[in-house]
Amino acid sequence: MLKAVIIDSSAVARGLLNTVLLDGGYDVVGQSHTCAAGLALLIKFNPHIVCIAREQMENGEDVVREIRTKWPKTLIFMVSSEFDAATIQAAHAMGVSGFIVKPFKADTVLNTIRNVVIAMVKRQRAAMAKESGDAAAGDGGEA
């Protein structure tokens, strides 16, 4: 079961997203209303997924960069009611893995997370296959 942390200043939004994730089979190990408390949850639980409100990302200086540095395999999902092309591009450049749109639609949220997880697994498998192929090619010519 994949572990998740939710960081959002809105208790209502945290509660709704918590319900969607739990119903979808995720283990929500913590919720926070601030980036600082959210980072403490990451230290404690080392989650696979972090859902962080756009406002928290804008207020929490370099929080995405810190998560990317300390937990490089953690998937980061930006949560917001509105996304424009510039926001999406900037978020991807920071290391955001995907986007969850408010108001939450359970199927959409779960499909978004599932698709990002599947894409990540495919990338990891391709990288491992490439490494295995490179290693095999290097071993083939030596006696």
Enumerate the predicted regions with their spans:
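Two-component/phosphorelay signaling modules centered on CheY-like receiver
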Residues: 11-30
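Acidic, metal-coordinating helix/loop segments flanking the phosphotransfer/catalytic sites
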Residues: 33-49
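Conserved phosphotransfer cores of two-component systems
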Residues: 43-45, 67-73, 94
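Conserved phosphotransfer microenvironments
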Residues: 48-65
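Alpha4 helix (beta4-alpha4-beta5 surface) of REC/receiver domains from two-component response regulators
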Residues: 62, 83-98
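C-terminal output helix
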Residues: 86, 104-113
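CheY-like receiver
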Residues: 118-143
